[in-house]
Amino acid sequence: MRTHIVALLIALTGSIAAAQGPALVVLNKAEASASIISLADGRTIATMPVGDGPHEIAISPDGQWAVAANYGGRTPGNSLTVLDLRTRRAVRAIDLGTYTRPHGIAWLPDGKRVVVTSEQAGAVVIVDVPNGRVDHAIATGQPGHLLTLAKDGRHVWTANIATGSVSLVDLDHGKVVKTVVTGRGPEGNDVSPNGRELWAADRTLNRITVLDANTLDSLASIPTGEFPNRVHFTPDGRWVLVSNIRSGTVDVIDAAARRAVDHITFAFDSTQANQTMLGTMGRSPQPEGILIAPDGRHAWIALSAMNRLAEVDLATRRVLRYLTTGKEPDGMGYVANLAAP
């Protein structure tokens, strides 16, 4: 008995010693890489290769793995890169075959599979990560771009930029429940923490469309800054953050009142700015990806034209610091307790 207790204590203390604290995994679109940034000191502690044009990333429920969707550049991408966050290495490339232009991605609750959009094939694809293969695909007939996964993992909502629509897809039964036109360019989307509302950002019409998450009936329209790209609820459901690429700001929207109450701004240095895949947009640092901490205290905004992230205190809505990334950061993932290598 004593031997077992000692062994257990050693295992526990060993796992505690191996913990390295919270970190971010950031995709750098223009250099086909992923950076791990320690939140303790803001330092990049590892950079790993991924496929061409990585846009979105998903962290496994246990925090040990990340999967990047390789959208591609001039040539359409058709792969996912699996990253081992403990060893800080890319360990596998999963070939998606004909399911090209993978973009939005999320882990399913089983911790073994991810769901990813294939924009070019018009499908939602379920991928078996441990076995490195496509499990099955659901034809949607829509060029799905970004997606939001329901908490129970049974449905996803996709924003279909090219057709100006959003779709609700039933993963259990492998079918599209409904598709509705919301405007001319919905991209970012998120579901309220209570699961009742879907918010979709239309980058062409500069507005948020609020929909009933179950019926996709339109409930409201909220004006935003120019070229809204991402939309995310805070964990308590009180606030919604919207990144406006052309305006160079992030709107803070009161979810209940359905109106913007603040606008977060960022430092911009034209001598340091680079042209992104979207070109140059005046004096905008081009805020794109948004990541909100699980406790709702901080948010990180990817400033793609400046090759850095802005860490924002959500209580004061002020930038606390800037974190250096690779070239053209966008998709991000949060790791609560990064394991030491």
Model-found features: residue ranges?
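Predominantly soluble domains enriched in secretory-pathway, periplasmic, or organellar proteins
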Residues: 9-341
